[in-house]
Amino acid sequence: DVAGLVPAKDSPAFQKRAAAAVNTTAD
């Protein structure tokens, strides 16, 4: 798991996932 290597807030994958979650919630 690379989550421990890169801060979640700095992870592009996390940002993309978070954005998708926000968009889904907004819908």
Curated annotation (Swiss-Prot):
It comes from the Bacteria. Residues 1-27 are annotated as: Disordered. One of its GO terms (biological process) is photosynthesis. Keywords: Photosynthesis, Photosystem I. GO terms for cellular component: photosystem I. Probably participates in efficiency of electron transfer from plastocyanin to P700 (or cytochrome c553 in algae and cyanobacteria). This plastocyanin-docking protein contributes to the specific association of plastocyanin to PSI. Belongs to the PsaF family. This is Photosystem I reaction center subunit III. It comes from Thermostichus vulcanus.
